[in-house]
Amino acid sequence: MNQIVLNIIIAFLWVLFQDEDHFKFSTFFSGYLIGLIVIYILHRFFSDDFYVRKIWVAIKFLGVYLYQLITSSISTINYILFKTKDMNPGLLSYETRLTSDWSITFLTILIIITPGSTVIRISQDSKKFFIHSIDVSEKEKDSLLRSIKHYEDLILEVSR
């Protein structure tokens, strides 16, 4: 977070040094790009990784989640309209590697807002999720657990 603040400060200083009559976004943007270059050159002196990398990971995460949301919505609609007799609802458990409260909460929210599944309970040690799914056949169960693991990997990548 310090890198973003520093980059914005560099951009504002750039605007001030240009001595223009009024604020121009193009000047601020060019100052921001100059700040990016400076911070990239000096990022080894910061304790965190270069912040643009985390922004890229967050964008990638959003894309993956939107894809999963759309495909699971279509799958749930398909079950409701055409496969009501074939549904096999049930519970399954998932053991997580996440440790921080915010990341566990975020994963819980991602599971809950994905159609066809919801978190019923989290164990006392916050390591195991108990999830209700619209279909717990082997194929669907594996697919759900794979997508949850993928979410978990992306959360770990963002939180590094």
UniProtKB/Swiss-Prot annotation:
Record bears the keyword Ion transport: yes
Pfam families xrefs: MNHE
Signal sequence extent: none
Chief location: membrane
Topology class, membrane: Multi-pass membrane protein
InterPro entries reported in the protein's UniProt record: Cation_antiport_E (IPR002758)
Entry GO MF terms: antiporter activity; monoatomic cation transmembrane transporter activity
Keywords: Antiport, Cell membrane, Ion transport, Membrane, Transmembrane, Transmembrane helix, Transport
Intracellular or extracellular location(s): Cell membrane
GO cellular component terms listed in the entry, alphabetical order: plasma membrane
TM ranges: 22-42, 55-75, 100-120
Assembly information from the UniProt record: May form a heterooligomeric complex that consists of seven subunits: mnhA2, mnhB2, mnhC2, mnhD2, mnhE2, mnhF2 and mnhG2.
Family from the record: Belongs to the CPA3 antiporters (TC 2.A.63) subunit E family.
Known role: Expression of the mnh2 operon in E.coli is not able to catalyze Na(+)Li(+)/H(+) antiport. It does however confer higher growth rates than the control strain at up to pH 9.5. The operon may encode an NADH-ubiquinone oxidoreductase.
Protein name as it appears in the record: Putative antiporter subunit mnhE2
Originating gene: mnhE2
